[in-house]
């Protein structure tokens, strides 16, 4: 029973875990379908991140609701970085069914010009727009 509790505890931490995305799986991840049908698909946020700018990464990702969150290292995801015209890190892109919906780009000071509430509001708008 003790081991079962430990396993359940570890699994619960993984539910909010942030996953990394690479060029190899980028398109499949932003086009992910959930098990409950198209109307239940959550938007996907990809944060383009740079190790040299670790101080300015988006740390509040676990507080976002109704979204799947991935982080992409710009040194590893050069094809995706080029395709989506990412020039600054951090950059957050919200996708819905593989379509780019909203972009939050860092400024020249390499800080994200949006806070948690701005990003959550954009997620909510994407979710509402896809309901019919």
Region locations from a protein language model:
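Bacterial Sec-dependent N-terminal signal peptides
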Residues: 1-20
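Local sequence-structure signature of Cys/Sec-based thiol-disulfide redox active-site neighborhoods
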Residues: 20-65
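Short acidic active-site motifs
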Residues: 32-33, 76-80
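Structural recognition of the beta-strand scaffold that forms the well-ordered cores
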Residues: 45-47, 91, 103
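Solvent-exposed loop/turn segments at secondary-structure junctions
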Residues: 51-54, 75-77, 100-101
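Short, internal strand/loop/helix patches
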Residues: 68-76
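Structural micro-motif
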Residues: 84-96
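Non-catalytic, surface beta->alpha helical segment in thiol-disulfide oxidoreductase systems
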Residues: 94-132
């Amino acid at each position: 029973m003790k081991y079962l509790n430990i396993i359940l505890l570890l699994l619960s931490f993984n539910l909010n875990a942030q996953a990394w995305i690479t060029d190899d799986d980028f398109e499949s991840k932003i086009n992910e379908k959930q098990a409950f049908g198209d109307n239940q698909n959550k938007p996907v946020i990809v944060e383009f991140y740079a190790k040299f700018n670790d101080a300015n990464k988006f740390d509040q990702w676990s507080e976002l609701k109704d979204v799947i969150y991935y982080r992409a290292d710009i040194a590893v995801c050069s094809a995706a970085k080029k395709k989506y015209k990412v020039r600054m890190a951090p950059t957050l892109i919200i996708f819905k069914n593989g379509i780019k919906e909203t972009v939050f780009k860092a400024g020249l000071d390499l800080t994200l010009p949006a806070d948690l509430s701005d990003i959550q509001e954009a997620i909510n708008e994407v979710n509402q727009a896809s309901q019919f």
